[in-house]
Design a protein with these regions (language model features):
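N-terminal secretory signal peptides that target proteins for export/translocation
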Residues: 1-7
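Bacterial N-terminal signal peptides
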Residues: 13-24
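Carbohydrate-interacting regions of secretory-pathway proteins
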Residues: 26-251
Length: 251
């Protein structure tokens, strides 16, 4: 004969409830706890002054255009190198990097001519194209009226800058751009649009803006076409805009 056991039903139910709650709490904590990082951040030299970070790819060092070619035919870039800067030589053509990139941090310094000529889009005009397709406008926008999404720092014909942070003509200016390329699915299906964050002279002017598509000259919705990595392009718009200290970090 088996011995008889006496159970206190309320106590048993309470004990089981506590056990279940404990298990639920442990499961919840496991599901919501921030995972501990496994990899120690890489140590780099951030550089000082105009010196690029140690993990950057220098695209223009103030001496040579060896990293640049003409968009038209791939021949060597014909812009002028003077006083540590490359200068647009009107009519020689838009140039691009030999290398191609995806997600990047881009630093570039530029200056429009000190002598003001023209107005609107005819004054110190150039452009920086990410992956050869998506333009951040370069323009003398200091006391220079033009359409809003054509100002310096605009994602051209898509987004005006949040503020106009332009310096006087002839003064050096900086763009720091965080660019994430679009992600495509089957065919030309866009799973995620390209995004840009832009700082102009240290001031935020584009805040994780979703790019509608490749730059067009008309204010119409552009259409994405599936692509891979692409070059950085600097535009010859006929004005002697200067560029220097150009580098990227691949993200």
């Amino acid at each position: 004969m088996f011995p008889r056991f006496s159970f206190n039903r309320p106590v048993l139910i309470a004990s089981l409830s506590i056990a279940l709650l404990s298990c639920s709490a442990i499961s919840y904590l496991a599901a919501t706890q921030i995972p501990e990082p496994k990899n120690e951040p890489k140590i780099i030299d951030p550089g000082d002054g105009t010196r690029a970070p140690s993990d950057a790819i220098v695209l223009f060092d103030g001496k040579s255009l060896s990293n640049w070619v003409r968009v038209l035919d791939g021949s060597p870039a014909q812009w002028e190198v003077k006083d540590g800067a490359m200068v647009v030589k009107a009519g020689t053509g838009t140039i691009r990097t030999r290398s191609e990139f995806g997600d990047i941090q881009l630093h570039i310094e530029w200056a429009t001519p000190a002598e003001v000529k023209g107005e609107g889009q005819g004054r110190g005009n150039s452009g920086v194209f990410l992956q050869g397709l998506y333009e951040v406008q370069v323009l003398d926008s200091y006391n220079n009226k033009t359409y809003f999404y054509g100002q310096a720092g605009a994602i051209y014909k898509q987004y005006p800058p949040l503020v106009n942070a332009s310096r006087k003509p002839g003064e050096w200016q900086t763009y720091d751009i965080i660019y994430h390329e679009p992600i495509f699915g089957a065919g030309d299906t866009v799973k995620k649009k390209a995004t840009m964050t832009v700082l102009h002279n240290g001031v935020l002017i584009q805040d994780h803006a979703e790019v509608y598509g490749p730059t067009t000259h008309e204010p119409i919705f552009p259409t994405y076409r599936k692509h891979g990595k692409g070059p950085i392009i600097l535009q010859d718009h006929g004005n002697p805009v200067r560029f220097r200290n150009i580098w990227v970090r691949e993200l």
